[in-house]
Amino acid sequence: MYILTIHTISDPQAFWSGQLNLPEGTELPMVMPSENGTRGVCLFKSTSVETVRNVVDGATSAVSRNEFYAINEGGALGLPA
């Protein structure tokens, strides 16, 4: 399943320079920061929203407010193959 994350970032340097420890079965094919780095959208492929939430919030909750949702793949355009 694909999961979209939306980030409102208070410390862009810390957020964008951090590393995520992705568990097996979780991929991060797209990362899209805003020009000034205070907003961002990421696309994950994983087994559940909860898996992505645990990884992202665990690494960034001190510097970002994060939103998560599973994508309706049947209605989406342009998802990675």
Where are these regions (language model features)?
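Short S/T/G/P-rich N-terminal loop/turn motif that feeds into the first structured element of a domain
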Residues: 1-57, 62-64, 68-81
